[in-house]
Design a protein with these regions (language model features):
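Cytosolic juxtamembrane regulatory segments of multi-pass membrane proteins
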Residues: 104-123
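A generic hydrophobic-helix recognition signal that picks specific residues
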Residues: 38, 56, 83, 123, ...
Length: 193
């Protein structure tokens, strides 16, 4: 999940929402996208292939060990970090899942957990982890307003605002053990193990 999960999610939609046919973020005709987005995906795919060609060229010119050391290993670390943060923000036993009939934007935006990763990481990541609820409500808001927005969101949401200061390794363990699936029946469902 932490190293190859993100690339496999993009490539074959592993662990993603079920779609008819071949679900891939690289397939411009996939049900993930609207018809008017086909050319956007094609242009993006060209960029991905150009990047892969550049990596192949660098591997040929500099050697595969150099590319492994300076590109692939850091890439896997970034994937690990991205998936860890995203998983912990969106997967918690206290968060309900709303089915299509009862879901709305406000409920969906509130279905995330602000987590404290400590002063240094919060600062280096522009508080995306401890102000993530604000990001869901105002995704285009500059990061330097996120802490102020979070203070107001806490007041507005009251008991529906979710913050967890559990140490990250323990939060990961708890979510991994208790958040295995959601029931197939019901409009509002919670994680089960």
């Amino acid at each position: 999940m932490f190293t190859f999960g993100w690339p496999l999610y993009l490539l074959i939609n592993i662990s993603g929402q079920k779609y008819p046919g071949w679900a891939s973020h690289y397939n411009p005709w996939c049900a993930i996208y609207e018809k008017h987005q086909v050319w956007d995906v094609i242009v993006s795919d060209i960029g991905v292939f150009a990047t892969l060609a550049g990596i192949g060229f660098a591997s040929h010119m500099l050697g595969p060990i150099t590319v492994l050391k300076y590109y692939f290993i850091p890439y896997l670390f970034v994937n690990f970090w991205l998936v860890l943060i995203t998983y912990l923000q969106h997967t918690d036993p206290i968060l309900p899942h709303y089915r299509e009939g009862v879901w709305n934007f406000q409920r969906g935006a509130a279905l995330t957990v602000d987590r404290d990763f400590g002063f240094l990481i919060n600062h280096l990541h522009h508080h995306i982890s401890d102000t993530h609820v604000a990001h869901h409500f105002f995704s285009t808001m500059p990061h330097y307003h996120a802490q102020e927005a979070t203070r107001h969101i806490k007041k507005a949401l009251g008991k529906h605002y979710h913050f967890d200061d559990t140490p990250i390794p323990l939060a990961l363990w708890r979510s991994w053990k208790t958040c295995r699936f959601v029931e197939d029946e019901g409009d509002v469902v919670f994680w089960k193990n």
